[in-house]
Amino acid sequence: KGEGFSVGGGYNTRNNELGQKSLTTAIVGATMDIGPGTLSGQYATIKDNNPSDLSTIAAGLAANPATAPVATLVQNAFIQGFRQDAHLYQIGYRLTSGPHTVAVAYNNMDDRRPFNADRYSYGAAYTYALSKRTDLNAVVTHLENKNTSQDLLGGNGFLGGVASAPGKDVNSVTLSIRHRF
């Protein structure tokens, strides 16, 4: 961290229960004081061709004569469904003045799997500090699901579930009070 800016990065990889290379993530982010606020940005890659803890599905299904014929198909469907290959881009600006904090942000998830479940969202948040431990919050967020993406917004604009249909856009308005004990 420097005077008016910071830069950071990380890399993580693991093997699944079969010893295959599994989830791998790489991330780089930076902040810079611009004007009265702070600009932040982040880029991440997420890759997982061999998801963890799925290798025993077929064996469990094969034990039952009714499901044995489809055991391998079911396991392969789970593996395909849990694979990840995406690039994530985020940018935001935060301004604090006295008890007031305003933040705006945009993010874009570029899904590189055959599903092509791309999505992007943007939003704004306002926080008013009633005291050092209590604040009021208002958050407005729009999430645009593309193709097969079905993300749903939860509290304060974070992901919170599954939309009712693929490609369905969602909006969120959250009003809250927070007290830290």
Language-model features: locations:
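Residues on the lipid-exposed face of transmembrane beta-strands in outer-membrane beta-barrel proteins
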Residues: 1-2, 28-32, 91-95, 124-128, ...
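Loop-centered beta-sheet repeat module
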Residues: 1-23
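Outer membrane beta-barrel
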Residues: 1-6, 32, 142-145
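Acidic, glycine-rich loop-and-beta core segments that form the ion-binding/anion-interacting portion
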Residues: 23-28, 32-37
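Outer-membrane beta-barrel "beta-signal"
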Residues: 165-181
